[in-house]
Design a protein with these regions (language model features):
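A nucleotide-sugar donor-handling region in carbohydrate enzymes
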Residues: 7-11, 109-181
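Short, well-ordered coil/turn elements that cap or connect secondary structure elements
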Residues: 21-24, 80, 129-131, 163
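Short beta-strands and strand-loop turn motifs
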Residues: 1-3, 29-34, 85-90, 138, ...
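Residues at alpha-helix caps and immediate loop-helix transition turns in enzyme cores, especially N-
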Residues: 11-15, 74, 98, 182
């Protein structure tokens, strides 16, 4: 199991502890200097480390999830070393985000796909992927929600030290690219 990225960052929850609890054997950590804002260095570092590891271990299959640029580096290594890729969350759309290009590129490299909706399955088929290799699985994140204790409003108020009378939740996915032609 190759673990890196936000799994190793405390401010994002250091989910590596959860991975260790699952008692996987042969966990390889890929530490990337997160202070380094240079995407080129991060990408090349991931590419080099993954390439060396995959040459040594010769995996039959690599499972990638999401749309972050880091997984494109790993998918590229798999492409050149002829390692099959399983991709979770292909076919999804995030308008105005570079994520789409990364996600679709990884989907084109992948041999097998786990998608969360029929719409995303159809999108992968439109991209030329084999229908027999696309599995409608739903979202593991949604499944995970049912396993966690939901915090009460009172507990949240206490933790944040604010009173939540009339409230709403707004999430924003920042626009990372704009269509220059329209």
């Amino acid at each position: 199991l190759l673990v890196g990225g936000s799994h190793l960052i405390k401010k994002y929850g250091f989910s590596f502890t959860e991975i260790k609890k699952a008692k996987y054997k042969n966990i390889k950590i890929v530490k990337i200097d997160q202070k380094e804002a240079n995407i080129e260095k991060i990408y090349l570092n991931i590419f080099k480390k993954s390439y060396k590891l995959f040459l040594k271990k010769r995996p039959d299959l690599v499972f990638l999830t999401g749309d972050r640029f880091e997984i494109l580096a790993i998918a590229s290594v798999c492409l050149y070393l002829n390692v099959k890729v399983v991709h979770l969350h292909g076919g999804e759309i995030t308008l105005g985000a570079i994520d789409d290009a990364v996600r679709h590129a990884v989907s084109k490299i992948a041999k097998f796909h786990f998608v969360t909706t029929e719409t995303y399955r159809n999108r992968l088929i439109q991209l030329g992927e084999e229908p027999k290799n696309i599995i409608l699985s739903g979202s593991p994140s949604v499944e995970n929600i049912t396993k966690h204790k939901i915090i009460t409003i009172h507990s949240l108020e206490k933790k944040l030290d604010i009173e939540l009378k009339n409230y709403f939740l707004l999430t924003i996915h920042p626009e990372t690219i704009k269509n220059q032609y329209f």
